[in-house]
Amino acid sequence: MKIGKNVFIAHSATIIGDVTIDDNVGIFFGAVLRGDQNSIHIGKRSNIQDNVVVHVDRENRTELGENVSVGHGAIVHGATVMDNALIGMGSILLSGSVIEEGAVIGAGAIVTSGKVIGKNCLAVGSPAKIVRCDESVGEQARKNGETYQALMKMHIDGKFTEYSH
C-alpha cells in the first residue's frame, strides 16, 4: 500500500492490499478499496465518494486517472477510468471496461465488461449507451473534480464536526 501526500481518508473507509493512492486524493466515508487479487491505482486529485466499492479480478486491475470522480455508491470492478472522468452515483463499471478522458457515466448506469466509453461522451442506462459526445461533457466532469478538491480540503482542515459511536 502506498499513500501520497495531502490525502483525506475517512475513518470509516477501508483500504486493503495492493493499493496506490496518489497526492491530493479524497477517500470518503464507507468506501472500500480492495486490491486483493490485483492492483488498484488512484490518480492525483481524484475522489472516491461515500460507499463506493473499488475492486479487481485476477485479469483486470483497476486504474483511475487524475481528477476522476466516483460518485456515491458506485462500483468500479477491474476497470480503467482515464483523466477528468465522472462516474455517476450508483453506477457499475464491470471488468475490462474503459472510460476515456472526460467521459461521464450517468447515475445508475451499468457499463458492461469490455465496453469502451469514448472521450467526452455521456453514457446512461443499463446497459450503458452513449447519448452524447462533446466538450461540455468533459467540462462537467472536470468541474465535479474541482468541487471535491475543495470539499476534501475542508475535511482535512477539520471544518466539519464528526460524530461516531
Regions found by a protein language model. Give the residues of each.
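N-terminal segments that cap or nucleate solenoid repeat domains
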Residues: 1-27
